[in-house]
Regions:
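Alpha-helix-loop-beta-strand connector modules within alpha/beta enzyme cores
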Residues: 8, 56-81, 137-140, 144, ...
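Glycine-rich, proline-tolerant flexible connector loops at the mouths of alpha/beta enzymes
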Residues: 18, 43-65, 182-183, 187, ...
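Active-site mouth loops of central-metabolism enzymes
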Residues: 10-32, 82-90, 126-131, 152, ...
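Conserved, mostly hydrophobic/aromatic
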Residues: 30, 37, 48, 105, ...
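N-terminal small/glycine-rich loop or linker at the start of catalytic domains
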Residues: 1-22, 111-124
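Active-site beta->alpha loop and helix N-cap motifs at the rims of alpha/beta catalytic domains
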Residues: 57-58, 63-131
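Structured C-terminal cap/extension of enzyme domains
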Residues: 197-202, 220-285
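Catalytic alpha/beta core domains of metabolic enzymes, predominantly
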Residues: 104-237
């Protein structure tokens, strides 16, 4: 079996330290967490920016500070920045990309209802429309390719996978664009084994894909992804808890658990250099 590529989502935007006290906020904390993730086996770090108080940030200077802190500690790791937000213009969502030129960036492949719902209180904590029209997709992928940024196509439902087809037909989608099968978000496809297998079948043959599972079901579905010759993402953005049920104290612990799981299935973990070769991603900045 080919080596497995581990990604680590370090912080996210929808949670805070009242949910998990170990979520990194500041550029220095993100740099330190990136190092812990890399030491445990991650080749890719996916990062949202935050202000020092933990609120989501889209200020370019914050991304630049994060970039410097991560590169200082992890000179060769593949940096992947978020571009997703509700209520912001597409220009606000991607203005940090030309300034920082990360190796990869999240490329959200379709519009959807998006929210966090509590069954206990029977209400939404927040919700909105995550808007990504085809015009938006065309604009974003052009900015990414102009800046040598590999698009990480985040697909929250089956139709999002198909949305790549016209972009590829127009010659806009780089050959090394990757598929992320995101599951468990309210408004997107539920996180079940059957749904993951269905999503995998929709991905064009020969394409790189990984599972992203937003819940404690992450470990069950990550095992399926690994067994089906795919890859998976872990980290405090997606799931605070280790397979034992204990809350993780760092992203490094999440990655270590993921590496152990992969090796139990017979998959060795790809190094950063091997990941760059497999995905055809040269060091961008």
């Amino acid at each position: 079996m080919k080596k497995l590529i581990l990604s680590a989502a370090l912080t996210g935007a929808a949670t805070n330290r009242s949910h998990c006290p170990h979520i990194p906020y500041t550029p220095v904390e993100l740099g330190e967490e990136a190092r812990r993730a890399v030491d445990a086996g991650a080749s890719i770090v996916h990062i949202h920016a935050r202000e020092d108080d933990g609120t989501p940030s889209w200020r370019t200077e914050v991304f630049e500070q994060i970039h410097a802190e991560v590169r200082k500690r992890c000179p060769d790791v593949i940096i992947n920045y978020s571009t997703g937000a509700i209520g912001l213009s597409v220009e606000e969502r991607i203005k940090h990309l030309p300034a920082t030129k990360p190796d990869m960036a999240a490329f959200n492949m379709g519009s959807m209802n998006y929210g966090i719902y509590s069954k206990r209180s029977k209400q939404f904590y927040w919700n909105g429309i995550f808007e990504n029209s085809f015009d938006t997709l065309i604009h974003v992928v052009k900015v990414m390719t102009e800046n040598n940024i590999c698009p990480e196509m985040e697909c929250f439902d089956t139709g999002h996978i198909r949305n790549a087809e016209p972009l590829r037909d127009m010659g806009l989608l780089p050959k090394n664009a990757t598929y992320s099968l995101v599951m468990g978000v309210m408004g997107g496809i539920p996180a079940t084994p059957e749904n993951l297998i269905h999503q995998i079948k929709q991905v064009p043959e020969g394409s790189f894909w990984q599972s992203i599972v937003i819940s404690r079901k992450q470990w069950q579905l990550s095992a399926i992804a690994a067994a089906m010759d795919g890859n998976f993402r872990v980290g405090l953005e997606d799931n605070f808890y280790l397979p034992t049920g204990e809350m993780a104290k760092s992203n490094g612990e999440c990655v270590e658990a993921g590496a152990t799981l992969a090796r139990m299935i017979g998959r060795e973990i790809a190094t950063i250099a091997e990941t760059r070769e497999m995905l055809k991603i040269p060091l961008n900045s």
